[in-house]
Amino acid sequence: MFFYEKFDIIVIGAGHAGTEAASASSRMGQKTLLITQKRSTIGTLSCNPAIGGLGKSQLVKEIDALGGLMAKVIDYSGIQFRILNSKKGYAVRSTRAQADRFLYQKNMNYFLNNQKNLTIFEQEVSDIIIKNYQVQGIITSDGKIFKSSIVILTAGTFLNGKMYIGSDVFDGGRRNDVSASILANNLKKYFSKIGRLKTGTPPRLKKKSINFDILKKQYGDYPTPVFSFLGKIEQHPKQVPCYITYTNDHTHSIIKKNLHLSPLYSGSITGIGPRYCPSIEDKIIKFPDKISHQIFLEPEGINSEIIYPNGISTSLPKDIQVDLIQSISGLENAHIVHSGYAVEYDYFDPRDLKMTLESKKIKNLFMAGQINGTTGYEEAAAQGLIAGLNAALKIQCKDTWYPKRNEAYIGVLIDDLCSKGTSEPYRMFTSRAEYRLLLRENNADERLTTIGYKLGLIDDFRWKIFSKKQDSISRERNRLKNIILQPKTVFFSSNNKKTIYLKKKCTAFDLLRRPEISYNDLILFLNSFLKKKIVIKNKEITEEIETQSKYFGYIQRQEKEIKKYKYYENKKLYCIKDYREILGLSNEAIIKLNKYRPSSIGQALRISGITPVTISILLIFLKKRKKKKFYFKK
């Protein structure tokens, strides 16, 4: 072994968590090393070639609001953009983009290669140098030593990864990529709570072998939405349709007949798979009453000859995969280019992490991505960003930062993982966010860009554009609040073709709160009698003003709930070294509180098994200590 080079921060793994972690720390001025087994696989979309979706697009836009890469990259790589839940309220609308997986990798590499302070190195990591439970660097498989005071581990599905196709088992975390078994086994010296999770992917199909003529086309939205705050429609490559087909009784009978050959049901795989992205075997067993399951045939790229059949993940033997694929309408002559497979891998209990994603056991070791029990590119990228920025803050001897549950979906993700842990792959949904009316995808920049600028994640160019937008929103909102409409004013709504008579005096902003009145209707009405005509062409600005108005009452209610939430979050528990010293706590409470070491009363509340009685005892204990004028170190 020999010393090679020293860095401020080393990131192991260049998937979605690793790329965001390395980008964040280097943007904040830290000399960063991003090390990966293969440079050619940086930013690979290992499974579904898509970014965003319900609950996920909110994460992507929050990453973007903090200067991250994912939104920028997909804007240059997306070949079909759609708004999901477009007929519902803004709180649950989510953008999804089909990606050209080759363009996505190319564009991710472009941004990383042009990032200052960032070095990319190709080699497998065999061990993390840890002395006295503190990180000091890494060792590569060929004996190179890279020294660093902070290491961020983002190994994805590669720690002791095993791939399954029927009875065939291979070492690997992804097709054509070997697992990081040496590193995984070395980490077992320091971590006892290591579990196994499972994920899977469908077979890939040859495009020319599919009969698209009998299938339903699915087009993207027009005009196409964008992900990044700085994104433009002109950045999008050529847009293409997807296609829809369905499984049938024959498909289901093939699967049932051969279920014993699936490693999921033969006992070969013990890890739990993602609940909300089940294999086709799981779907048939768990939903026996369904006569068919929808499959989206998604192109893997503009010029790609490969189709991704979304919704039919499987690890059945290769010959059975051929039979089940060819039983489906439009796929009767389909040729499988790559067989579907399942992957089982190691993950760590995220409750052993601080909210910054630093290990509670190993000083200066941060962990992000699927190794923390999540599933999905977006969840991994969000964790990578938080780990990267907090690693940089630690180098700079500055206070740590992470968003709270009321500030971002990223905050919900981090809090759920670190407070509750997970026994199955964790996926983000809008339903997980109790303050989702405030955490809309269209106000991510308003919520997070200011702190991003203060942290050094956002450049001056973006800050100026953001500030200008916020000024425009503020001016227009105030203008509407200062326009007084008198009783008996007649207003026509184009939404429901009705004439509205005002019964009492109100402001134009208040009038906009009515569900049947759109911003465009209001402006047309106001311009008909105002001397100074107002025309705002920026759709983002008008949507935000309309949302603020229509959600006004609900937002006020949630802000009251947040005050209560903050009260508990501000009651810190750092002063308690051993919960056995507190009289009245149950044995279960003592064991769980000593085990998970919650940072606040709020976090303690979210630990399974912690009762209101326990919380009351803790609050009384803190109050007594405060009266005795104890100093609490935050």
UniProtKB/Swiss-Prot annotation:
<comment type="subunit">
    <text>Homodimer. Heterotetramer of two MnmE and two MnmG subunits.</text>
</comment>
<keyword id="KW-0520">NAD</keyword>
<dbReference type="GO" id="GO:0002098">
    <property type="term" value="P:tRNA wobble uridine modification"/>
</dbReference>
<protein>
    <recommendedName>
        <fullName>tRNA uridine 5-carboxymethylaminomethyl modification enzyme MnmG</fullName>
    </recommendedName>
</protein>
<dbReference type="InterPro" id="IPR040131">
    <property type="entry name" value="MnmG_N"/>
</dbReference>
<dbReference type="InterPro" id="IPR020595">
    <property type="entry name" value="MnmG-rel_CS"/>
</dbReference>
<dbReference type="GO" id="GO:0030488">
    <property type="term" value="P:tRNA methylation"/>
</dbReference>
<keyword id="KW-0274">FAD</keyword>
<keyword id="KW-0963">Cytoplasm</keyword>
<dbReference type="InterPro" id="IPR044920">
    <property type="entry name" value="MnmG_C_subdom_sf"/>
</dbReference>
<comment type="similarity">
    <text>Belongs to the MnmG family.</text>
</comment>
<dbReference type="InterPro" id="IPR026904">
    <property type="entry name" value="MnmG_C"/>
</dbReference>
<dbReference type="GO" id="GO:0050660">
    <property type="term" value="F:flavin adenine dinucleotide binding"/>
</dbReference>
<dbReference type="InterPro" id="IPR049312">
    <property type="entry name" value="GIDA_C_N"/>
</dbReference>
<dbReference type="Pfam" id="PF13932">
    <property type="entry name" value="SAM_GIDA_C"/>
</dbReference>
<dbReference type="InterPro" id="IPR036188">
    <property type="entry name" value="FAD/NAD-bd_sf"/>
</dbReference>
<dbReference type="InterPro" id="IPR047001">
    <property type="entry name" value="MnmG_C_subdom"/>
</dbReference>
<keyword id="KW-0285">Flavoprotein</keyword>
<dbReference type="InterPro" id="IPR004416">
    <property type="entry name" value="MnmG"/>
</dbReference>
<keyword id="KW-0819">tRNA processing</keyword>
<comment type="function">
    <text>NAD-binding protein involved in the addition of a carboxymethylaminomethyl (cmnm) group at the wobble position (U34) of certain tRNAs, forming tRNA-cmnm(5)s(2)U34.</text>
</comment>
<feature type="binding site">
    <location>
        <begin position="13"/>
        <end position="18"/>
    </location>
    <ligand>
        <name>FAD</name>
    </ligand>
</feature>
<feature type="binding site">
    <location>
        <begin position="273"/>
        <end position="287"/>
    </location>
    <ligand>
        <name>NAD(+)</name>
    </ligand>
</feature>
<dbReference type="Pfam" id="PF21680">
    <property type="entry name" value="GIDA_C_1st"/>
</dbReference>
<dbReference type="InterPro" id="IPR002218">
    <property type="entry name" value="MnmG-rel"/>
</dbReference>
<dbReference type="Pfam" id="PF01134">
    <property type="entry name" value="GIDA"/>
</dbReference>
<dbReference type="GO" id="GO:0005829">
    <property type="term" value="C:cytosol"/>
</dbReference>
